[in-house]
Every structure is written in C-alpha cells, then in structure tokens.
C-alpha cells in the first residue's frame, strides 16, 4: 500500500495522512521453534516511508507476551563479523534484531542441549531495504 492511497485531502486542500487502525506485520516462524522473521508493512512515497517496527498487540497474538527490557544499537564497519549472542539463566533475554543502514546476514544457532533442534541454525539477510526483523526468544 502506498501513502497516496491513504491520504485524505480536506475541502481546503490540506492533506492528512490517515493510517489504518490495524497496520499489519507478517510473522513467519522458522524451523527453530520460537524464532520468527517479521516483515512490517511499509507505507512509502516520494517523501520517505512509515512503518511500525513493534506493536504489542500483534507480538502477543503471534509470539506471546514479550517483555523487552532494553533497546540496544550497534554499528559495525564493513567486513566485521560479530560473535554469537548467547545468554542463559537469569541473563537471558529475547531479542528483536533489525538493520537501519546497510545489511547483515544474521544467524541463530540452537545451543540448547535438550532441544530436538540442537545444533541446527537459521540465517536471514536483514537490511535497510527489506526492513525484515528477526525475533530470537530467550534461551538462544
């Protein structure tokens, strides 16, 4: 959907952006249970774009209750490889990963020894162009 499709023009010629009450996101669960690729609906025009990167109502519907406790941002120079994000016990937390500039190939590895998918992984390209996000639940 393009922004032009949801712009209201008043009788005086003023333009108002009328965003729908329910902006959708596509949630696709990966082969590792609880890991989701999320594709937000993007409304774009010549001025730029608008999207919701998180909506509690939708996350609870598709993923369950998620209590995000912090928001981090990092910048990596070209060619940098980051290490595994691994936490367990009281330090574990769910993560919502997205890229605001450039692109990364993000990999989630199941390191839970008792899991039926132990040792398996999923990888996805996240970029400022595709706007995809990766949800990684606690324990990974």
For the regions a protein language model found, what residue spans apply to each?
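Acidic, Ala/Val/Gly-enriched low-complexity intrinsically disordered segments
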Residues: 4-9
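Conserved metal-binding segment of the jelly-roll/cupin
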Residues: 126-140
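Non-catalytic, conserved peripheral segments adjacent to functional cores
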Residues: 24-129
């Amino acid at each position: 959907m393009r922004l032009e499709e949801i712009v209201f023009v008043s009788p005086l010629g003023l333009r108002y952006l009328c965003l729908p009450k329910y902006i959708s996101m596509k949630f696709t669960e990966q082969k590792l249970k609880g890991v989701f690729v999320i594709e937000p609906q993007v409304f774009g025009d010549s001025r730029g774009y608008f999207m919701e990167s998180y909506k509690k109502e939708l996350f609870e519907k598709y993923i369950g209750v998620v209590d995000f406790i912090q928001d981090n941002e990092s910048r990596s120079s070209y060619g940098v490889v980051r290490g595994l994000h691994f936490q367990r016990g009281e330090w574990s937390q769910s993560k919502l990963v997205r890229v605001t500039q450039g692109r990364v190939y993000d990999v989630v590895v199941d390191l839970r020894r008792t899991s039926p998918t132990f040792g398996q992984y999923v990888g996805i390209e996240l970029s400022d162009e595709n706007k995809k996000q990766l949800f990684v639940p606690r324990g990974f």
